[in-house]
């Protein structure tokens, strides 16, 4: 019997369509061979790790729980250990009577969010034991506390000195008002919910070491969240990390002033995904009255890099009193930008006083160079960070960085060597320093108008006349910048720059924050 032509054509079509089906679909009903999983670039979580001079277990006795540990924070922990050791001998903000007793003084330390207890173990094993009277470590999680107790045995810790608690962090600190000399707080996200209790549990002159990892909020991605958390409005700019530090310090300072206390920043740095602040907190009602001079607002151009920064208040001399606070009226002379004629927007308030203490950084560098601290894994990187910050202190009165690439884009110019750019700034009598954390950012005492003139001068010298306004829309802000007269004559001579590894690469892919620790319920 002959096959029906229509049926024959249909079979051919089905065969053709079947050949087009991907192999994965064909084998759905079969039992496919299990694929080999690609090896991960980051090691699986170990049960035990050694960091500094401490060895800790990350799991409890029955291995049903793994405590939170992030290797990316080892830089943070290394710097904190040597900072606390430096604080033991730092006498700058002490009264003469306290300076005499500093050599014999013993210090108490609290770490309210401990997880593994690693920081506490490192303080016990790496800091001079004769300088420590008490180390308090705490975690809410019962199984985390179980891990901490395992680690106490592992590191042969004297339990008379190191005390373990299982409490809510703020509750523990409120129970111990004015008890601690050093408060080390490293939370997931913002430290702001813990600030009030940290301030109150610290003694007069105590050292606070705080970490903030909520960078999207502090850097301007969610300004409405920044406002209700920190009381400040950010602006999304290339120098957002410095803005983040200044927003956090403003919020901390305004909180401390409720208790007639002021902050003295020692070191503020950012690395990878977080900012870390070290500051001393002191009782001083008179200094609290000077806080308005340390807070300020910024008007930033919506298009170019021009900005105006004004403090909340100014000193006004008075014969009857030492000084009177005269509040600024928060107005600016020109509503529009003097560089490109665009509108300016207001943001802040920020901390506009010092981010660092030069004496502290020099003492920290001195300690770091000693052989007793050579074992620190991040010794050389800490040294580079501190030297970079020390270099920036040449222009410590200049608030916020500039973005070198943005200046080039604003005048439709290809980026040229930063060494040549620095030479041009220096030739006009101004200073410039490169940021310690981003090679594209810099600080200078040259006003934005002068920087744009340098860019335009370079373009005129190195481009043809017809290319000066090429691809520039007459209605754009770039056109307004380029059409302004050049008032300076810079010399483009390259400056020899220091060659060292200031900007190291991450050691592994996905090097950064870990997921938020989840609450583990007992079955």
Where are the regions a protein language model picked out?
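SAM-dependent transferase fold signal centered on methyltransferase-like domains
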Residues: 1-523
């Amino acid at each position: 019997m002959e096959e029906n032509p229509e049926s024959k054509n249909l079979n051919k079509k089905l065969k053709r369509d079947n050949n087009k089906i991907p192999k994965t679909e064909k084998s759905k009903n079969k039992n496919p061979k299990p694929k080999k999983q690609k090896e991960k670039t980051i090691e699986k979580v170990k049960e035990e790790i050694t960091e500094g001079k401490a060895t800790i277990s990350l799991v409890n006795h029955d291995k049903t729980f793994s405590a939170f540990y992030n290797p990316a924070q080892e830089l943070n922990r290394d710097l904190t250990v040597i900072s606390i050791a430096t604080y033991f001998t730092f006498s700058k903000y002490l009264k003469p009577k306290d300076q005499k007793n500093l050599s014999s003084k013993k210090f108490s330390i609290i770490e309210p969010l401990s997880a593994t207890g690693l920081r506490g173990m490192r303080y016990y094993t790496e800091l001079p034991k004769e300088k420590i009277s008490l180390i308090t470590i705490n975690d809410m999680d019962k199984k985390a506390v179980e891990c901490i107790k395992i680690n106490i045995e592992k590191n042969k810790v004297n339990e008379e000195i190191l005390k373990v608690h299982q409490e809510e962090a703020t509750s523990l600190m409120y129970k111990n008002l004015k008890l601690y000399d050093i408060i080390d707080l490293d939370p997931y996200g913002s430290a702001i919910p813990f600030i009030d209790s940290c301030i109150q549990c610290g003694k007069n002159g105590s050292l606070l070491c705080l970490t903030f990892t909520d960078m999207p909020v502090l850097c301007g991605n969610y300004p409405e969240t920044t406002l209700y958390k920190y009381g400040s409005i950010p602006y999304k700019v290339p120098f957002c990390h410095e803005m983040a530090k200044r927003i956090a310090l403003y919020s901390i300072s305004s909180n401390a002033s409720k208790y007639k206390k002021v902050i003295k920043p020692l070191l503020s740095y950012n690395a990878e995904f977080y900012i870390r602040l070290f500051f001393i907190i002191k009782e001083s009602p008179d200094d609290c009255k000077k806080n308005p001079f340390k807070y300020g607002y910024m008007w930033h151009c919506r298009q170019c890099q021009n900005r105006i920064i004004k403090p909340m208040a100014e000193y006004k001399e008075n014969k009857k009193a030492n000084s009177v606070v005269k509040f600024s009226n928060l107005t600016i002379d020109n509503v529009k930008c003097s560089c490109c004629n665009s509108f300016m927007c207001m943001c802040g308030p920020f901390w506009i006083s010092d981010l660092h203490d030069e004496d502290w950084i020099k003492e920290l560098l001195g300690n770091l160079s000693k052989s007793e601290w050579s074992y620190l894994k991040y010794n050389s990187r800490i040294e580079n960070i501190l030297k970079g910050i020390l270099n920036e202190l040449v222009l410590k009165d200049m608030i916020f960085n500039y973005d070198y690439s943005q200046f080039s884009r604003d005048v439709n110019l290809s980026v040229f060597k930063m060494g040549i750019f620095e030479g041009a700034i220096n030739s006009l009598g101004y200073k410039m320093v490169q940021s310690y954390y981003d090679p594209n950012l810099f600080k200078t005492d040259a006003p934005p108008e002068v920087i744009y003139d340098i860019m335009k001068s370079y373009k005129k010298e190195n481009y043809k006349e017809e290319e000066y306004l090429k691809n520039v829309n007459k209605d754009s802000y770039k056109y307004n910048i380029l059409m302004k007269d050049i008032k300076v004559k810079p010399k483009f001579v390259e400056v020899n720059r220091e060659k060292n590894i200031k900007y190291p690469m991450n050691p592994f892919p996905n090097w950064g924050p870990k997921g938020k620790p989840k609450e583990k319920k007992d079955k």
